[in-house]
């Protein structure tokens, strides 16, 4: 008997991001979070200011996806990096998948500095 992966839908790529990065094929496709996420972010837990900050960030992934401060597209990695200020400045990495039965998913979550966010914003202007 194969185990079914436990997931929940945490959001969708908004139209502004779809238009900015020409990601029309991802329109109306869900972004999911699975229990596997905790394995991937274990190494980042100690980077958060506090346990409360980590828990708050994980509990608000859907808000980060829905109302990011800034989003950067890494075309070569097929990833969207969602940045938002919560208790920490955080980055939520969404891996984009198009194959049938494969959802785009939360690949990582970690705190970042204000400096890092500004550098990514500058980098995005250079790409445009």
Regions found by a protein language model. Name each.
Residues 1-128:
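Ribonuclease/tRNase effector modules and their secretory precursors
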């Amino acid at each position: 008997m194969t185990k079914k992966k436990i997931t929940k839908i945490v959001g969708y790529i908004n139209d502004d991001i779809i238009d900015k990065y020409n990601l029309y094929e991802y329109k109306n496709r869900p972004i999911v979070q699975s229990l596997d996420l905790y394995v991937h972010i274990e190494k980042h837990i100690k980077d958060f200011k506090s346990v409360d900050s980590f828990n708050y960030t994980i509990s608000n992934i859907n808000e980060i996806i829905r109302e990011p401060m800034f989003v950067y597209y890494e075309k070569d990695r097929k990833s969207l990096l969602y940045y938002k200020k919560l208790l920490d400045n955080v980055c939520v990495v969404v891996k984009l998948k198009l194959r049938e039965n494969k959802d785009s998913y939360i690949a990582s979550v970690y705190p970042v500095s204000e400096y890092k966010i500004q550098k990514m914003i500058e980098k995005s202007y250079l790409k445009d």
